[in-house]
């Protein structure tokens, strides 16, 4: 998943960019995991909590170095796209809409997670992202507010994973389509084999040399990319 998000960031940096809306970014998977880890300390004492420089680098778009966008959240970015791993066995796509103060969730198997549980799984983002903006965005640009982000599950015209096992692919394709401003037409079980092969080829071609090892491991484990080597 990390490799896919790195690929999308690299595409965002191209001139011309394929993305019609340039006020977007794709969150790094390692940063999300670190944010979730720090949530315990954050929720235990917000007044004493200070975000690490690591998070500031991601906030201003200078990290990850190999796919830095140099876009600052809220100032240059309205939408943060993210892949969230929930319940230890399922991926969902997030469109974190900063101006609307809302996390839009795209879930290929929605019956697996109740609405309250999904809200709980997103809690570290709902609380820490507003706090990051309050700490890192000048008050003349954004009035300080630590109010939780709302959560909304998007269901209309969202294709479902009727053959469970491809939630990671659906998640990546949701994010790609949202960023491109296109519909989800063609994202279905009948096309899944072709989608897998195309995605594997794109990842191999665009990020194999710059993606960090854990990103490739995540991708290999969750997406099960087919081998591309020539047969003996």
Residues covered by each model-derived region:
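Enzymes acting in ubiquitin/UBL processing and closely related pathways
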Residues: 1-232
């Amino acid at each position: 998943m990390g490799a896919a998000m790195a690929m999308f960031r690299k595409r965002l940096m191209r001139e011309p960019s394929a993305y019609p809306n340039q006020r977007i970014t794709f969150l790094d998977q390692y940063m999300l995991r670190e944010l979730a880890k720090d949530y315990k300390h954050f929720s235990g004492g917000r007044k004493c909590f200070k975000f690490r420089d690591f998070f500031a680098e991601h906030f201003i778009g200078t990290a990850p170095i190999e796919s830095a966008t140099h876009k600052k959240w809220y100032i240059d970015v309205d939408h943060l796209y993210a892949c969230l791993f929930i319940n230890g066995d399922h991926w969902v796509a997030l469109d974190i809409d900063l101006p609307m103060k809302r996390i839009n969730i795209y879930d290929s198997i929605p019956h697996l997670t109740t609405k309250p549980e999904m809200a709980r799984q997103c809690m570290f983002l709902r609380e820490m992202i507003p706090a990051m903006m309050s700490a890192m965005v000048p008050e003349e640009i954004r009035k300080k507010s630590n109010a939780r982000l709302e959560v909304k599950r998007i269901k209309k015209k969202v294709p479902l994973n009727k053959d469970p096992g491809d939630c990671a692919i659906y998640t990546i394709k949701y994010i790609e389509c949202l960023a491109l401003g296109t519909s989800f037409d063609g994202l279905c079980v009948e096309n899944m084999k072709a989608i897998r092969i195309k995605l594997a080829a794109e990842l191999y071609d665009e990020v194999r040399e710059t993606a960090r090892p854990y990103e490739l491991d995540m991708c290999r484990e969750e997406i099960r990319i087919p081998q591309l080597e020539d047969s003996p």
